[in-house]
Amino acid sequence: MPTFPIFFNVLSVAFTASLVFIDSAAAQPRFDYHSIRGRQPLLMATKRCEGETDFELRGKSRAQDMRNFGALWSGDAHLLWDGVVGESLQTSFEVDAAGVYDLVLQLTIAPDYGILDVMLDGTDVCQSIDTYNAQVGLAPLLTISDVSLAVGRQAITFKLTGSNVQAQKFQASNYLMGLDYLELKRKDNSLLVAPVADISGSLADSDAFPQQALKGAPLSTDELTATMKQFCFRCHGGEATEAKLDLSLFGTRETLLTRIEDTQRIRDAVARREMPPKDERQPPDAVRARMLATVDAVISDYLKDHRSHSPVVMRRLNRYEYSNAVRDLLQLRGDVYPLPEKTIRVDNLYFDPASGRFPNAVRVSNRTMGKEQIEEKILTSVSPFAIDLQADGGFNNRGNQLSVSPILLESFLTLGRSIVDSPEFDAYCKITDSFFTSPQDATLEQQQILARMRLLPFLELAFRSPVEEAVLNRYHGYFSQCLTKTNSFSQSMKDVVAGVLASPRFIYISESAFEDGDVPLNAYELATRLSFFLWSSLPDEILLAAARDGSLLKPDVLDLQTRRMLEDPRSQALAQNFARQWLRLDQLVTAVPDIERFPQYYSRIGCEQWGFGLQMMVEPLLLFESMMVEDRSVMLLIDSNYTYRSDELQAWYGADLPFADRENRNRFNTERQQFSKRLLTDRRQGGVLTAAATLTMTSSPLRTSPIARGAWVATVIFNQPPPPPPDVIPPIEADDKVIEAQGLTLRERLKQHQVNASCVACHAKIDPLGFALENFDAIGRWRDHYSSGLEIDATGELFGSMPFQNVVELKDQLLAHPELFLRAFSEHMLSYAIARKLELEDAPAVDEILSKVSTDHGQFSTVIRSIVQSHPFQN
C-alpha cells in the first residue's frame, strides 16, 4: 500500500490550491515572457562594437588574443579571419536605433595581411584598404561617413581583393584580416532610450495565471474526521500508520494546530493530488476543496499568532564573501586568492547592468577550463581557508554551516597578515598612497593624528557599524605601538589592517535579531544584509551614508538603494554565488561520463583528461546574467528563445558533432573562447531544464538517471526536495544496455525496482519529472530512441492534473502555470538573502512576494525588490 509522501514545502500555502482543479485541456493563451524587458538601455551617441565579441563569428573567423603584441587593442583582442583572394567574410553587428551614422573602423595591420573592400548590405562603402605592415600594429582609423542604418543586425562584408607585393602569405595561400572594433557615431550626437515592453497590468487581468476553479466551505470537525476515515484511514489511521502518520489523531483543531508541520504535509499532499494515491478511491473535487479550506483556515490562524521566526544564527563570512569584502575594503585590483566559486573567468569587463544590454558575445574561460586559467589577478603567497560546504537544499551562507573552529580562527590571523605582506600588495592596492602612506616630512605626532583620521572611516566600513571611541582608541593604540617599534607608518598601518581582517567584527555578520522574537534590523544591519545579499560584499559609502543618517529604514530609500545596487557591476555576485549554487552546477565538476561510452566528452591535454562540462557550465550562467542585466522575466529560465554558446557547444546540441571522431588529444578547445548569443527555434532547447549542463550532471556514467534528474527538477524548479533515499536500496543495473538486453526500457526497469510502498510514493512524484528529460542521453544530446531501438516514453503528469507528452509540453505546463516556478524561485532567493532555511512562519511574506512578482510576470528586479521589502528580510 502506498505511503504518505514525507517530503513537502512548508511554504506552499496560497498557490497550490489553484493546482487542484485546473483543466489542462482548456489552457489559456500563453503569455510571451520574452516581452518583459525592464531596465532601459541608454543608446549613447557613440557605440563601440568589439570585433571579437560583437560581430558574428562565421566560417574561419575567430577571436585572437593580442596581448602578446602590446596593449594597443581594445579589449586586448580582435576578430581574425583568413582567406584566399576573392573570398569574403560576411558578418554583422547590432544597431540599437535607426539613424544616420559615421562608422569608424579600427583594423589591424601585419606582414601577412591583405587588401580589402568593405560592403554594407552588398554596397561598396570602402575599397582597396591595404592592411600590410612590416610590424603588427593598428591601422589608421578609417571613417565611413553618413551611413543610414536600420535598427537590428546590420550585415557587413569584408572581401579580400589582393595583397601588397611585400605581404607574406598565411599558410601558403591565404591572407589575413583583423578587426579591432567598429564605432557607430550618431550624426545628431543625441542620447536615446531604447523602447521596452509595457509591463503594466495585474495578476487578475493576465491570461497567464490560472484561476482556482472551485472553492469550498471549511468542514466541521466531525465532517473532517468522517472524510479522512473514508479516504485516508486505511493507510493512515489506527494501527495503519504508514509514513508514521496517524490521521485518526487529527480530528480536532487543537491537534492540527499543535502538529502544524504535519498539518502542512497533509495539506500539500491533498492539494497536489499526491494523496490519496491514484490506485485508491479519490474524493470528489468538491470534497477535496472543502478539506483544503479546513486546513488552510487552521494554518492561517496559526500564522496570525506565530509571526516571529527562528533567529538568524550569527555567521562568519564564507570564503567568497571574505575575498570580496577584503577586495572592496582595501580597493584591490582583483581577488585576494583563487576562487573556484567564480565559475566564469574573463579578462575584460562585460557585466554592465546599468547599460541594460548584455553583449552579443563574451570571451570567457571556465574556472578549470584547461591550461589557460585566468588567475593573474590574485595576491601570491596568500592561502584561502577551506571551501565552504553547501547546506542540504540550500546555500553556503547559513550560520549553522559557518562556524569558526580554533584552527580556522588561527588561519584567519595568518590570512590577514599574509594579505598585507604579499609582495604585490602595494601595487595591487589602490589606497596604498591615500591610506598606507604618510607625507615624507610628517612628524611622529602628525603621523599619529593622520592615522586616527584614516582609521575612523576605515573601521566603520570594515565593521559595518558605528565605531565606538573605545574601539578606535584600541586600534589607534596598536598603531602607536607598531610605529614606535618599526618607525614605519606604512608597516604600522598594515599591522593594524591585518588585525582588522582577523577581527570577529569583520569576520562575523552579527544581528540583533539573534534575540528571541522579531527584532527589526537597525540601519547598519540592514545595509549589511542588503550588500551581502546583492554583492556578497561590504556596503559602499553611499549605502553606509544612508545607514548613518537612518534614512535607509524608509521604504522608498531602501528601494532606491536596492535598484542602485542592482545596476552596479558588483551585483554579478548573484550569478556567481546564488545561481551557481541554486542550479547545483558544482555537481558538473564531478560528473564522469564513461570514457568508453562517451569518448566525445573528453579531451586530453598533456597527461590530463578534461571534460566538455567545462563549456556546458558557462551556458546557464550567461543566460542568468543576461536576464539580470536586461531585467527580464525569470520565466526565461524555464523556456528561452536564446542562449549563449561557444561554436563547439552549439554543435553539441546538433545531430552532427564535428569533433566527435577526433582522437582524444586536443579534441576540443579547453582554453578561453567566445560564447555568442544564439537564437533558438527548437523549444527542446532553451532555459535551464534542457541545458546540457543540467542533463549531464544528473546522469550516471553509463546511462541517464531519471531519479536524479527528477530530484533535481523537484528541488531546483519546484523547491520540493525529496527526502534522502532509504539506507538499503535494491541494486539496479548501471548500464542501460544491460537493461535493454532484457527487453525493458529504463522506465519499466525502475517500476520493477519499486518494491515497497515508500518507494512508490516518492517515485510517483520525481520519476515523471525525470522521464520528461529521457530523450536527452547521459551527456545531454537528443535521441529519439534508445540504442536498442526501444521507444522512449517521456510522458508524465505534473501534480496530478497537468499531463504532458514530452519535455516541450512540460515547459508549456510551467509557462501556463507560472506561479509554480515563481514561488519556488522566490523562496530560493529569499532563503539565500536571509541566510537561513525558510519556515512556515515565512509563508505570508512569500505570498506577498509572489503576488508582486506574478503581477510583473516574473521580472527579475521585482523578485529582488519584493524580497528586500519583505518582513523576513528586515527582521
Where on the chain are the PLM-derived regions?
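Low-complexity, glycine/serine/threonine/alanine-rich intrinsically disordered linker
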Residues: 28-39, 189-245, 257-875
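Bacterial N-terminal signal peptides
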Residues: 9-19
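Residues embedded in well-ordered secondary-structure elements
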Residues: 16, 80-82, 92-94, 107, ...
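Extracytoplasmic
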Residues: 28-201
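Bacterial N-terminal signal peptides that target proteins for export
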Residues: 1-11
